[in-house]
Amino acid sequence: MARVKRGVIARARHKKVLKAAKGYYGARSRVYRVAFQAVVKAAQYAYRDRRQRKRQFRQLWIARINAAARQNGLSYSKFINGLKKASVEIDRKILADIAVFDKVAFAALVAKAKSAL
């Protein structure tokens, strides 16, 4: 059986990792062993933060809706409860968008929520 030298495979693997670590500071972009650890850690952060991003956007939407609802004399929880009772099915993303860009329409939604309470 022929002897297999792994130089080509190893170089390709190292090249792949160093390419992924491009732009990292110092040894993290130059030394394979350090770069590999940095790339793995970056992937872990990316995985975690893809899930966190969803939570953070929901928090942002709720904060915006709460601020706009309070300007119209209603707390966030009462506003959402009123919308549910009035059977208005608009999600928080759209509500936050309306609160920021169309204050008149949001005031109408608040009035509808108040009447349902």
Curated annotation (Swiss-Prot):
Keywords: Ribonucleoprotein, Ribosomal protein, RNA-binding, rRNA-binding
Pfam families tied to this protein: Ribosomal_L20
GO molecular function: rRNA binding; structural constituent of ribosome
Xref: SUPFAM superfamilies: Ribosomal protein L20
Coiled-coil intervals, chain numbering: none
A Gene Ontology term for the protein's cellular component: ribosome
Biological process terms in GO annotation: ribosomal large subunit assembly; translation
Record has Cell inner membrane as a keyword: no
Family: Belongs to the bacterial ribosomal protein bL20 family.
Annotated function: Binds directly to 23S ribosomal RNA and is necessary for the in vitro assembly process of the 50S ribosomal subunit. It is not involved in the protein synthesizing functions of that subunit.
Protein name: Large ribosomal subunit protein bL20
Species whose genome carries this gene: Glaesserella parasuis serovar 5 (strain SH0165)
